[in-house]
Curated annotation (Swiss-Prot):
It catalyses: L-glutamate + NADP(+) + H2O = 2-oxoglutarate + NH4(+) + NADPH + H(+). Its EC number is 1.4.1.4. This is NADP-specific glutamate dehydrogenase. Homohexamer. PANTHER family: NADP-SPECIFIC GLUTAMATE DEHYDROGENASE 1-RELATED. Belongs to the Glu/Leu/Phe/Val dehydrogenases family. It comes from Schwanniomyces occidentalis. Keywords: NADP, Oxidoreductase. The keyword Oxidoreductase applies.
Length: 459
């Protein structure tokens, strides 16, 4: 394998290895050996910015956090990727996310490069005033490095609509102009319709296409038992869409535990969870405070300290939608396969460990089909790209127009992953389900590599 020499950055190393392995295990480098020259260049960020964020808490004391922005690759357009506020944030995680973002954005077909940023600040338990002051301090350091045609951040874990508002307001005051420099904005000040639900809906759309393709259109979501992790935006909207089309959602989770349901979680429960999560409540607190809603015919069981993968019996579909590496290899991936799961699509970035992915790929011959995050959860960034286009024109498209454009992007994205998986397959038995993992990596890499050759970054 082409090495990058960064074993001290495990998250980034996994993302790098996944891409390079997919390319080396295909016929791409045999047919087009010049593409090998791109790997050492594309795997190093164009720029990494690290800065101090000093801010005042409610006691009048100064607190300090580490802020970052990884501007990874701009060959296809301005750097584009979210901001994450979470105590786990470090450079390895942001480099992994930024690296993935390059290729995820490439699959949308929109003019966006790849980047990621954030801070090790934890918004949980903080007052609204503290979060506002922190956002202003963070933007004071970041503002000089971003712009509508340079770098357009968005939200991520710990950065929702409230935080985007504070960040945008701070940027506007500092720069004395109104640019579409952030996406995920409010609908009355430059946001796009369908943005909040896009990632969850599109993860669902990818699964829908997988089921249709694998069964030649004979099966749909109706009656399928779907195991979801997470309980944030992605999981909430994916759950509602699954239920709408006749599927049965059997689990949700958060950092403290999981809820599982034999008969299926209902929309009223999802909406209650969504409202409570805005107040940073745990699933345990929510189920205890709303006993009537979560008992009786629609009862759920709360399981403390565990993920849901091996806890619900038989199910057909898995949608990891919480955070990175939430499906492990030896135990959880094998448990998914043994429970009858046939379709796995990552609503989160790097939702599965390398060992878990190996289990899924090894079982493609048993009709187990896996879609990586860059192919399955690019709906959010696709609508972010559409929000950038609307901001440039100073217009707001209707929900129907955004939805139509998003569906076209996602169907094209699926085909763009499916076709190269077959075209560049080096597998002896290529009659079964093609590897969407390899297809997504090949298709996105070719697009980025061609742009880098054209622009003289590689020659």
């Amino acid at each position: 394998m082409i090495k990058n020499g960064l074993p001290h950055e495990p998250e980034f190393q996994q993302a790098y290895n996944e891409l390079v392995s997919a390319l080396e295990e295909s016929t791409l480098f045999t047919e087009k050996p010049e593409y090998k020259k791109v790997i050492p260049v594309v795997s190093i960020p164009e720029r990494i910015i690290q800065f101090r964020v000093a801010w005042e808490n409610d006691n009048g004391d100064v607190e300090v956090n580490n802020g970052f922005r990884v501007q990874f690759n701009s060959s296809l357009g301005p750097y584009k990727g979210g901001l994450r506020f979470h105590p786990s944030v470090n450079l390895s995680i942001l480099k992994f996310l930024g690296f993935e973002q390059i290729f995820k954005n490439a699959l949308t077909g929109l003019s966006m490069g790849g980047g990621k940023g954030g801070c090790d600040f934890n918004p949980k338990g903080r007052s609204d005033g503290e979060i506002r002051r922190f956002c202003v301090a963070f933007m004071r350091q970041l503002a000089r490095y971003i712009g509508a045609d340079t770098d357009v951040p968005a939200g991520d874990i710990g950065v929702g609509g409230r935080e985007i508002g504070y960040l945008f307001g701070a940027y506007k005051q500092m720069q004395n102009n109104w640019y579409g420099v952030l996406t995920g904005k409010g609908l009355t000040w430059g946001g796009s319709l369908i943005r909040p639900e896009a990632t969850g809906y599109v993860s669902f759309t990818t699964l829908k296409k997988m089921i249709e393709k694998a069964t030649n259109g004979k099966e749909s979501f109706k009656g399928k038992r779907v195991e979801l992790s997470g309980s944030g935006n992605v999981a909430q909207y994916a759950a509602l869409k699954v239920i709408e089309l006749g599927g049965i959602v059997v689990s949700l989770s958060d950092s403290k535990g999981s809820i599982v349901s034999k008969n299926g979680i209902v929309p009223e429960q999802v909406l209650e969870i969504a409202a409570a999560k805005l107040k940073f409540k745990s699933l345990e607190e929510i189920t205890k405070e709303s006993v009537k809603l979560f008992s009786g015919e629609n009862s759920v069981e709360y399981l403390a300290g565990v993920r849901p993968w091996a806890k619900v019996g038989h199910f057909d579909v898995a949608l990891p939608s919480a955070t990175q590496k939430e499906v492990s290899g030896e135990e959880e991936a094998k448990a998914l396969v043994e429970a009858g799961c046939k379709y796995i699509a990552e609503g989160s970035n790097m939702g599965s460990t390398k060992e878990a992915i190996d289990v899924f790929e090894a079982n493609r011959s048993n009709n187990v089909w896996y879609a990586p995050g860059k192919a399955a959860n690019c709906g959010g960034v696709a609508v972010s790209g559409l929000e950038m286009a609307q901001n440039s024109q100073r217009v707001q498209w209707s929900a129907e127009e955004v939805d139509a454009k998003l569906k076209n992007i996602m169907y094209t994205c699926f085909d763009n992953c499916y076709d190269p998986a077959i075209k560049y397959s080096a597998e002896k038995n290529a009659d079964g389900l093609p590897s969407l993992l390899k297809g997504a990596n090949i298709a996105s890499f070719i697009k980025v590599a061609d742009a880098m050759f054209d622009q003289g970054d590689v020659y």
